[in-house]
Amino acid sequence: MLKTAEDIRQLNDRVSYAGRFLDNLRNEVGKVIIGQSYMLDRLLIGLLSSGHILLEGVPGLAKTLTIRSLAQAIHARFSRIQFTPDLLPADVIGTMIYNQQRNEFVVRKGPIFANFVLADEINRAPAKVQSALLEAMAERQITIGDTTYKLEDPFLVLATQNPLEQEGTYALPEAQADRFLMKVVVGYPTRGEEQVIMRQNVQGLAAPVVNPVVSMQEILSARQMTRDIYMDEKVEQYILDIVFATRSPEQFKLDKLKPIISYGSSPRGSINLAVAAKAQAFLNKRGYVVPEDVKSICVDVLRHRIGLTYEAEAENITAINVIEQILERVNTP
């Protein structure tokens, strides 16, 4: 662990220099995507911290286009899996097929073998398919037949779900949702952004080509540097206070939250707050984490890790309301 001010200063200079590629990446993706800078930054946090992202938003908000454009900008392999009720695990991970000419079984790899995997409408697939995908996310390897295959690095799963249509869907269990680094709610574009989008589509303009501007090696180096970013023990304690407040709010003088929360965040909440805060610091081209980094990613990291009671639902209290009250109460270092 870094201890001296000189160590931190040197790391800060290295991160500031190495983080210059982020501007090129944002500009290149911005040639195609109008707005959605918030979603893009969340995808970059996932990329830097090796964490998978759950995206929630209505159709037509450029989720697929943003992810594909980001993959093209770093010369990564992209695949899209449309989840449906009749999908089988083999359709995701692959299977063994019989080759009559060679009189043997050969492996046919599934779409999971890519750097960026878009799992579209993950809540439309049955539990066994969701489990196959989530196991691959956790293990970062796939077993087909008797052979185990390592998945390429970087490997990032971006799963989407539509908040409007619930008919014919299979709710993602809390234990499965907990595996995602973040749950990001994708919002609508602004009025000005939507006007630009409308004009481009009405005029039938050809979409600009996204060129590779960042190498895979730069991404992997940035990941390692993100892990090295300094986090003071006071910030670590701040993260722990936030997470423990979701479990025992009465210890932080938040007694009114006790009947609202059915269960608090698992230890994955603490881990993911720490790694995402480091990635946020890297996005800010800083070699150390400050409390504002934690606050800025807190809602997206914790919103799917907190269970609410029926009383909370009856009063229209959301996980965001709970997190905001905790952030107001917990002392900032």
Residue ranges: model-predicted function:
Residues L11-G19, V32, K183-K256, L283-G287, ...:
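Conserved C-terminal "switch" segment of AAA+ ATPases
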Residues V106-N115, I144-Q161, L172-M182:
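AAA+/SF3 P-loop NTPase mechanochemical coupling elements
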